[in-house]
Amino acid sequence: MAEYIVAIDQGTTSTRAIIFDKSGSIVSTGQLEHEQIFPKPGWVEHNPVEIWNNTREVIGQALSKADLTRHDIAAVGITNQRETAVVWDKNTGEPVYNAIVWQDTRTQPIVDRLAAEGGVERFKPIVGLPLATYFSGTKIVWILENVEGVRERAERGDLLFGTTESWVLWNLTGGTDGGVHATDVTNASRTLFMDLETLSWRDDILDVFGVPKSMLPEIKSSSEVYGAVESSSLLREVPVAGILGDQQAATFGQAAFDPGESKNTYGTGNFLIFNTGEEIVHSKNGLLTTLGYKLGDGKPHYALEGSIAVTGSLVQWLRDNLGVISSAPEIEELAQTVEDNGGAYFVPALSGLFAPYWRADARGALVGLTRYVNKGHIARAALEATAFQTREVLDAVNADSGVDLTELKVDGGMIANNTLMQFQADILGVPVVRPVVAETTALGAAYAAGLATGFWENLDDLRKNWKEDRRWEPKMDAAERDRQLRLWKKAVTKTFDWVDDDVRNG
């Protein structure tokens, strides 16, 4: 009897395979980082071949650590960094260009061109998203327009597009030898091409973008058998049965299945998702309307999302670019050497600002500096930036939904940072709750795969698995909270309109 599920978590900085048991507990993990490629300012790329090779290797790591074989595995689930665009040749399996990552801002001129008629919200009533460099659609256009010969090959029907889950699925299920070219509704909802109501590609929008429909994957639910593993002998014949974009997967892994439930993931960026149930809620406050999940033939569940571009990656930047710390966990020790931020505020608009501002022209700023400020204050200001940005997104959720959040469920790498979690509770004025299993992204993908294959029977099975690990209660008084928020918002305004038109369009 197969007692376990493998979740492949293809993230922004690494690819992991995590094996879960029926209780949702982690049995073993394999993980490999991949190279972050920065060819020019604002450009971020990954090598898709490296990602696929790493995927195969981490599956082997996880299985060998747990001393398991394919016969012990009931199903495979995939979760992924969303929006990151891969275009490859279906005949050779070779990518035509590196994957263009969600953080990449090179497509701003394409966004401006598309927004010239109808503005950045031109397609928002249909797809739930503003025109922005963040989403896959403009990245595909850039590859079609800038890589030699690609437009002609795409028109001939030789090229396929997918976000990284599609790339991994296609390779896992056979690649050039019958690989399944599919995506799920959550990932499809991040392209700018999918109609939120019909859950299908919009021909009229594809025509405006100039993207051949033949490139696009088939849209499926988040929980069904897409195909069986072929090429990886370690998991041969195991069904691939769950796909969720990483933030939707984390929401699913937090058992936030019902309207009004939410979670905030602290990773490279931060992503707050608020479940709106079967209702499509169009934001008036800078949030995205997106798919939450769709289980097999069931009705789709929708969500509001606040995406923050730079949170955990600010800590990486302090480590790698400035050498302020030598490892990410040191940021907390450094922040604890001071009582407060010393009047310094760090707005990490390193790739513009996402929700709720959507300002591609913003750039990072460290403000409020005096001779008093030291690196401890800067470390604290960097951590606090994550909490302030989360507060602004939550304010937008409250305004759109009319529901005030009573507590915030959290997950992701940064929730190990107790200093940050306490400040988050302080600046929100509501408790922050951490689950026992912090790897909720991979867990969500495992849940989707397990539901499709009968490993778990229903959502109640999954709710029983969720357990609280720790809770932080707010300690800051309201006057101090208001003062800090006022200064933060003042700091944010200093980052606007930083990119000159000649630079942006050059």
UniProtKB/Swiss-Prot annotation:
Q: List the transmembrane segments.
A: none
Task: Please write the reaction equations for the catalytic activity of this protein.
Answer: glycerol + ATP = sn-glycerol 3-phosphate + ADP + H(+)
- Write one Gene Ontology MF term: glycerol kinase activity
Q: Which Gene3D superfamilies match?
A: 3.30.420.40
- Indicate the enzyme's highest-level EC class: transferase
Protein activity control: Inhibited by fructose 1,6-bisphosphate (FBP).
- Gene Ontology CC annotations of this record: cytosol
Pathway in which this enzyme or protein is active: Polyol metabolism; glycerol degradation via glycerol kinase pathway; sn-glycerol 3-phosphate from glycerol: step 1/1
At which positions is glycerol bound? R82, E83, Y134, D246, Q247
Q: Does the keyword Nucleotide-binding apply?
A: yes
Alphabetized Pfam families for the sequence: FGGY_C, FGGY_N
Q: Does the keyword ATP-binding apply?
A: yes
Identify the residues that bind ADP: T12, R16, T268, G312, G413, N417
Q: Which SUPFAM superfamilies match?
A: Actin-like ATPase domain
Q: Which residues bind sn-glycerol 3-phosphate?
A: T12, R82, E83, Y134, D246
> Which keywords are on file for this protein?
ATP-binding, Glycerol metabolism, Kinase, Nucleotide-binding, Transferase
Q: Which HAMAP family match?
A: Glycerol_kin (MF_00186)
Q: Which family does it belong to?
A: Belongs to the FGGY kinase family.
Q: What is this protein called?
A: Glycerol kinase
**What organism, scientifically named, is this protein from?**
Leifsonia xyli subsp. xyli (strain CTCB07)
